Amino acid sequence: MRQPVFWSLALAEITDPDYTHIAVDVLPAHATADPSAWARSLFSLKSLPRSLAWAMRARLLLNARLGPPGWCEAFQVGQVAGDEALVAMNGRLLDLRVGIGVDEDAALVRVVTAVRFKGAHVQRWSWPVRAALPFVMRGMIGRSRRTLSGVTRA
């Protein structure tokens, strides 16, 4: 029997996070086991909740006037090690690391989020985000599962 082991690039980058969230789901039968493909799918506009996707699309329309938004480059795969890809973002108010891992043997996909807040005031206003993140992440993983497995909705 295998011994349980937990490791993530997200927790290796931020060793003392102020907030963490872990989501695990089943790897669909015909889906890719490439963690970078999962990371790209997870942070694509198709996987985001509709309200966030519309806000980002509206911001993209303003590019000509305001210049490209920083998040266009922020949510790109920065590193791949073994069965996990890392998406990193360093912001003015927080540092974010998201490790997207695919365990092909166990047929699992895991998403580990680690956040370091910069300043006490940021921790206070982050409570709504903390409360919503599990639900948002479940939806993002579900949409990515459907996209990467080739399942279409009727």
Regions from the PLM with identified roles:
Residues 18-24, 84, 108-110:
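Intrinsic-disorder/low-complexity, polar/charged segments enriched in Ser/Thr/Lys/Arg/Asp/Glu/Gln
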Residues 30, 43, 82, 116, ...:
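Residue-level marker of positions within ordered structural domains that often coincide
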Residues 92-131:
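Beta-strand/loop substructures that line and gate deep hydrophobic ligand-binding cavities in soluble
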Residues 54-58, 117-118, 140-147:
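Short C-terminal domain-edge/linker segments immediately following a structured domain
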Residues 124-154:
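A conserved amphipathic terminal alpha-helix motif
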Residues 1-61:
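Hydrophobic ligand-binding cavity/cleft-lining segments
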Residues 67-105:
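Hydrophobic-ligand binding "helix-grip"
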